[in-house]
């Protein structure tokens, strides 16, 4: 059983991590496609 505060913190962390990964991937793709 998870407590609401724990679940909320987990979702916030997951969202932040997902955004961070998307930014990193975007930068890597842009730098990789640069001719």
From Swiss-Prot:
Keywords: Membrane, Transmembrane, Transmembrane helix. It comes from the Bacteria. GO terms for cellular component: membrane. The chain crosses the membrane at residues 10-30. InterPro entries: YoaI-like. It is found in: Membrane. It is a single-pass membrane protein. This is Uncharacterized protein YoaI. It comes from Salmonella paratyphi A (strain ATCC 9150 / SARB42). The gene is yoaI.
């Amino acid at each position: 059983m998870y407590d609401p505060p724990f679940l909320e913190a987990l979702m916030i962390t997951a969202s932040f991590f997902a955004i961070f990964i998307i930014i990193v991937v975007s930068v890597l793709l842009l730098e990789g496609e640069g001719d």
